[in-house]
Amino acid sequence: MSNYFDKIEKVKYEGADSTNPFAFKHYNPNEVILGKTMAEHLRLAVCYWHTFCWTGNDMFGVGSLDRSWQKTGDLLEGAKQKAEIAFEFFQKLGIPYYCFHDVDIAPEGNSYKEYVHNFHTMVDILEKKQAETGVKLLWGTANCFTNPRYMSGASTNPNPEVFSWAASQVFNAMNATKRLGGENYVLWGGREGYETLLNTDLKREREQIGRFMQMVVEHKHKIGFNGTLLIEPKPQEPTKHQYDYDVATVYGFLKQFGLEKEIKVNIEANHATLAGHTFQHEIATAAALDIFGSIDANRGDPQLGWDTDQFPNSVEENTLVMYEILKAGGFTTGGFNFDAKIRRQSTDPYDLFHGHIGAIDVLALSLKRAAKMIEDKTLQGIVDQRYAGWNGDLGQQILAGKASLEDLAKIVESKALDPKPVSGQQEYLENLVNNYIYR
């Protein structure tokens, strides 16, 4: 195994009083909460792209990070070195899963033939590394947005040859995900949107992406992939407007093309921020629509209008997120993938550990606080009482379709209905939640 991170043996749980920066203060993977271990609840994953592929570049500057595997003249050899170091990191951090795009793990090459050769070579290596370490693949995906061929979209591109290239990448990436035991396959339409309506046929592009997703579902069943298909919503960036704007928009799209039973959502915190929603809102919406699948854990900056992909650090925010997840029954095939990157000035390789350790502890503490909310049932009891009238005769008749507008007008008149406003108790409920978080 690689020894790139030679200062660390393995990150372990030492408890809240520990001052060791390379120890977990709250994440005890074997601690049982609501009948499952923390590890089973959280299903943590490290992302390949931000962690091992990013150079530290931004819109105004070149890469600032010193990564040995990015300096090799032979790109495939660099990819092999990167895989060794990645699995060293996974093992020493002690997380069970990782995630990747196809071109994260292998150089794209200059032709389709080179792409396939490089990708298959690296899949062979990842398969061996998984067997050696026990680390598993949470999900795989294809990068159909970085190459200039995708500047006008992938499945929504005006050129069917570009559509075909995207299909070829998804074909290879899904096959690899199945081979590696991946539990999900993600589709993020990085450039599935538009810059201007002046050169865009919205109806045609919607039909194209709808057919593409149908083809993805068809291939899943053809190869016997038993994992979950996931779409990741995002409102904009890099395009001005993306078609998978938010969870509700994705659900409408799935319904239009008959895919609502086939595809769920992978929700990213920062994407919720960009869409003008809270992270909690997006998860609650997905659960209500029965399309909740997985999470990309990170945070955005409300003062900035772009995807900052910072590590989550708010127990207040994530307690409510965990509460929604627990109410929905928890993850099945999904989990918490850290789609987060260290800052451009964080040039020490061990900053990767600090970012992940802190984020994992935030999720662990949030899980414990949310579990208390579930166990006590106080909050849910207040919500149940608020809607109790719908369990009575009138409410049930309305929901069962046994009352028309005319029927209800007659009831209001005959019974002289005069309902009085009832307090929503928002301030009390906010105090109640804070009591769980801070006690």
Swiss-Prot record:
Keywords, comma-separated and alphabetical: Carbohydrate metabolism, Cytoplasm, Isomerase, Magnesium, Metal-binding, Xylose metabolism
One annotated GO biological process: D-xylose metabolic process
Residue numbers annotated as active site: H101, D104
Catalytic reactions on record: alpha-D-xylose = alpha-D-xylulofuranose
Subcellular location: Cytoplasm
Binding site for Mg(2+) 1: E232, E268, D296, D339
Required cofactor(s): Mg(2+)
HAMAP family with a match to the protein in the record: Xylose_isom_A
Family: Belongs to the xylose isomerase family.
Protein's recorded name: Xylose isomerase
Species of origin: Actinobacillus pleuropneumoniae serotype 5b (strain L20)
